From Swiss-Prot:
Keywords: ATP-binding, Cytoplasm, Developmental protein, Nucleotide-binding, Nucleus, Phosphoprotein. Changing residue 144 to A: Loss of binding affinity to Nak and drop in binding to single helical peptide. It comes from Drosophila melanogaster (Fruit fly). InterPro entries: Numb/numb-like (IPR016698), Numb_domain (IPR010449), PH-like_dom_sf (IPR011993), PTB/PI_dom (IPR006020). Residues 1-71, 519-556 are annotated as: Disordered. Required in determination of cell fate during sensory organ formation in embryos. Restricts developmental potential and promote maturation of intermediary neuronal progenitor (INP) cells probably acting as an antagonist of Notch signaling. The gene is numb. This is Protein numb. ATP binds at residues 22-29. Residues 81-208 form the PID domain. The modification Phosphothreonine is found at residue 430.
Amino acid sequence: MGNSSSHTHEPLERGFTRGKFGDVKNGKSASFRFSKKSPKKMDRLRRSFRDSFRRRKDRVPESSKPHQWQADEEAVRSATCSFSVKYLGCVEVFESRGMQVCEEALKVLRQSRRRPVRGLLHVSGDGLRVVDDETKGLIVDQTIEKVSFCAPDRNHERGFSYICRDGTTRRWMCHGFLACKDSGERLSHAVGCAFAVCLERKQRRDKECGVTMTFDTKNSTFTRTGSFRQQTLTERLAMATVGTNERSVDGPGSAMPGPPAATVKPFNPFAIERPHATPNMLERQSSFRLSTIGSQSPFKRQMSLRINDLPSNADRQRAFLTAAAGNPMQTPLRSVSPIAEVSPAKSAGADPLSAAAVAADSVSQLCQELSQGLSLLTQTDALLAAGEDLNFNNNRSINQNIIAAEKQVQHVHSYAPPTAQVTPRVASTTPTYQTLHSQSPSRSEQSIETSTELPNAEQWLGHVVRSTSPAAPKRPTYLANVGRAQTLASGTGAAVGGGGPDDPFDAEWVANVAAAKQLSPDLPIPSTARSPLARHSTNPFISPPKAPAQSFQVQL
């Protein structure tokens, strides 16, 4: 007891102080038991004792497990191969292949402070996929065609990485992994098996497709042979059956190419056949070919709308070639006459102003006659409606109607169609209202040589004026019917006694006068031998007499 030092029995809590919240803090004057460290030699001794009492597993290298690698190849082909890994992330590299590039990328990823993600690496012939263990989310989904290189890490046993092309940024990226239970060599072997499966599928597609391409450097042209048509399911099953039969042959010498398996088309009586296109529709053409186009169809042409095939362009080209050959095409006459123009031959040797004035006077005359005829039609309807109330005692009105009947007969025999060279002049008239005989206006015609007819527009207007007959009365009466009959019957007798110019608008007054004569025979009958100068015109449009005025002038 005396040999022991005084400090061997110090309390364990000496040197410990409690904080504000009751926690224990270790100060500088802590207990010797907690502050004194063991020497390094003692640590080595303890470690050796622990290792000796533990059963240590023998380390077997991955190269001595070929049976597991064969199982990995079958698992890759069946898309059931998976490894537990830690995904370190990805980093950009500047080369598409090389073990040194992969090792440098893995070194950078291990030194980074990024926490690795535990996941499951699925390897198949389609691609590489990494699924998070906790969230089951897809971390990496890489198609096997975009992977350019893969290799294990020579500095780390469980390291593995591959280089691929990023689809968005088009950069070379290196993805790093650390295998949890397996080595990096096994992961690299599995990815190599995925490369082989992808290559076999591509070669099989090319063989089934049968498309070959050749490039001619002289013409810089590509030549494709074959078709990209995909085989049907029946054809694929037949090919698989043939391949199985060939592999099942025992000896290599007895392998004989047998006939292809006959494919039996299944028959379903309830199936409706799919509609197919006709052979005409499958022909290569510039436009879709329809059946015979009817008259009611909006499609009228059986050809494509090429520039050279248009009817307008074809006619224009044919006309140009015909004109160039010296045989101009004869265009058909138009149904509507064009606007008449004054010919320079018409005014040859004469003053052009006088010729234009003559043409303007003829047009003005026709317009005046047309307006007078329209006004007369309206007044005739009103007169026939009140025919029953006519005052037969008015001698002045009766005599005027009789004179108008005589002038109508003269108009039938002496009226001539106007021409462009005739200038009508109306003489001054002085009607007398006290006597029964009145002086009728006389029209003198200037004899001018007729060279040409009127233009088409003037001919049409003159034809309308000559052929227009008064409209039938709304309420036809006996007086009107008898008047028309008397007018036609008395035309011959009136033509003998009366001669001279006629007024075309006096013919409408004869009907009422003839009817009045038949109903009242006591009325005085005018003499047929009366001079034309002693008669008074019954035309209400030219009395009181005035000089003809030019209403308007048209310069053609």
